[in-house]
């Protein structure tokens, strides 16, 4: 009973109710104005047409554009305020300007290496084009001979993660969307507190919405008492505001500028299967060493400086030439490939995460294997997947067998028929929920990161990942994919057609609301 009451009176529920009341009151005022004044009603209809024309002219995915135009014209009292809140992908102009200042300052320390880019282009011009795109639009260079270790689940990664934290001598940076006290986080905090006593600079950054239900009130005070510096990205406020849209969905750990982790894993017990949620929780993480770690260091510092309104001494964190040399000496013997970390931001209107995926799809020749927890994609992504399958590429996607969000899962399933009809194989992960976000193709390239195949990840959130070419982690991702297929169920068109007419109609109708989910 106490647990139920805690959920009912949680910050998210109460804050959500306040926002719903504000939204409802706003809609009611609009409705009242249109009912009592024919002139206002006419002006409102004109406004809906003007807004629909504006949306149609915007540079955005056609699928989401269609959804918004339908909502604005068919349900203007709902669609217009909803578009104001959820339809605009960018942060406020003032926020963008502040972040641009920080970004330009730190990017000066991430100069690309022409030699590495030339070597990649000489080996594979197509891969070089991908790297060139990331260097130009994500702002982070490609590196050579970084050590990459892929982990197929949280419990495989966790012991090494703790050991790496214990080796820290200078600093530890952690940036996560979700953190929740329990076996995993408590053990990490214990190590961090000890490291603070040893003089290590420990910083922890978390998302205000992601942690609203998981972190106790004033948990940051608890951490600060232990000497751990904290920053919260966009704290939740129960107000109708566009800034609630843009979340920090990244997962980053950096240790002394020598070791970095990223992937789908947050800091909560389900990610290491110490707590059962939606069956077995399958995720993915990647450990990196070498010069490429600097990219993750700068990603962290960029957001940290913005939140706290400070200017870090980036030269302190940038490895010296001698340190770079020592890092290179430790690289695994079979690591001769290329690595390029990247971040995606809603500030620049450049969909880096999606374009990385589209580039991998378009360049696949033999196979393309994908892990994703959600499949809410636009026509561009659907067309790319289908074209690859029709061209003879073995295209396979794995989605959860047990979903975490029922409505979102209906939307995911609504994409099945078209893809299956056109040769794309779709598997549901029988043991439970798959939260990994991975692409791997042709034993040559792969990406592991935080980018879901849904509107929010592709358009609205701060995300990150690492693109790899001919590293040992590429083959490790492939091996994991093959094992996962064996544990999963391949969906057939006949199965989908057995669903009732009402269910299939409901799935189709949900597509109109995809941008809101």
Predicted feature residues:
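Catalytic-core elements of nucleic-acid end-processing and repair enzymes
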Residues: 437
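Short glycine/threonine-rich loop-to-helix capping motif typified by GTGT followed
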Residues: 383, 409-413
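N-terminal localization/anchoring segments of enzymes in phospholipid and broader phosphate metabolism
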Residues: 1-355, 359, 363, 387, ...
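Thr-Gly-centered strand-to-loop micro-motif
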Residues: 371-372, 399, 429, 448-449
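Helical hairpin unit composed of two closely spaced alpha helices linked by a short loop
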Residues: 374-395, 400, 405
């Amino acid at each position: 009973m106490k647990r139920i009451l805690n959920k009912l009176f949680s910050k998210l529920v109460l804050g959500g109710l306040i926002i719903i009341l504000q939204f409802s009151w706003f809609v009611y005022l609009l409705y009242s104005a249109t009912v009592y004044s024919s002139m206002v009603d006419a002006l409102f209809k004109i406004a809906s047409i003007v807004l629909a024309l504006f949306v149609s002219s915007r540079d955005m995915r056609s699928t989401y554009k269609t959804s918004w135009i339908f909502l604005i014209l068919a349900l203007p009292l709902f669609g217009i305020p909803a578009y104001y809140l959820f339809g605009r992908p960018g942060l406020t102009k003032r926020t963008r300007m502040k972040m641009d200042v920080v970004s330009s300052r730190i990017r000066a320390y991430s100069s690309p290496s022409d030699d590495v880019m030339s070597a990649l282009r000489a080996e594979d011009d197509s891969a070089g084009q991908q790297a060139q795109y990331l260097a130009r639009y994500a702002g982070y260079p490609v590196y050579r001979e970084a050590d990459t270790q892929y982990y197929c689940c949280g419990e495989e990664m966790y012991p090494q993660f703790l050991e790496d934290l214990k080796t820290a001598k200078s600093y530890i940076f952690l940036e996560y969307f979700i953190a929740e006290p329990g076996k995993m986080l408590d053990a990490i905090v214990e190590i961090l507190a000890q490291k603070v006593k040893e003089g290590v600079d420990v910083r922890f950054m978390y998302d205000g919405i992601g942690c609203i239900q998981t972190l106790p009130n004033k948990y940051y005070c608890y951490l600060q008492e232990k000497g751990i510096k904290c920053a919260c990205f966009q704290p939740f406020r129960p107000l109708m505001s566009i800034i609630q849209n843009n979340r920090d969905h990244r997962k980053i750990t950096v240790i002394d500028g020598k070791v970095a982790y990223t992937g789908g894993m947050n800091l909560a017990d389900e990610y290491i299967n110490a707590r059962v949620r939606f069956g077995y929780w399958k995720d993915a993480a990647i450990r990196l060493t070498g010069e490429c770690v600097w990219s993750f260091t700068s990603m962290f510092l960029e957001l940290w400086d913005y939140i706290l309104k400070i200017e870090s001494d980036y030269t302190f964190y940038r490895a010296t030439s001698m340190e770079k040399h020592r890092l290179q000496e430790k690289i695994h013997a079979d690591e001769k490939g290329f690595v390029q970390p990247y971040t995606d931001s809603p500030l620049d209107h450049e969909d880096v995460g999606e374009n990385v995926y589209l580039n991998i799809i378009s360049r696949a020749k033999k196979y393309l294997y994908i892990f994703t927890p959600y499949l809410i994609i636009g026509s561009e992504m659907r067309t790319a997947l289908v074209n690859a399958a029709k061209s003879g590429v073995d295209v396979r996607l794995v989605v959860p067998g047990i979903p975490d969000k029922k409505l979102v899962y209906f939307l995911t399933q609504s994409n099945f028929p078209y893809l299956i009809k056109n040769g794309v194989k779709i598997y549901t992960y029988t043991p439970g929920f798959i939260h990994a976000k991975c692409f791997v193709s042709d034993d040559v390239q792969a990406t592991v990161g935080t980018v879901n195949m849904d509107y929010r990840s592709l358009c609205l959130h701060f995300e990150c990942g690492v693109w790899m070419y001919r590293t040992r982690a590429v083959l490790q991702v492939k091996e994991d994919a093959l094992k996962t297929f064996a544990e999963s169920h391949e969906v057939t068109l006949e199965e989908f057609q057995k669903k009732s007419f009402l269910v299939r109609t409901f799935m189709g109708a949900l597509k109109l609301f995809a941008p809101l989910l």
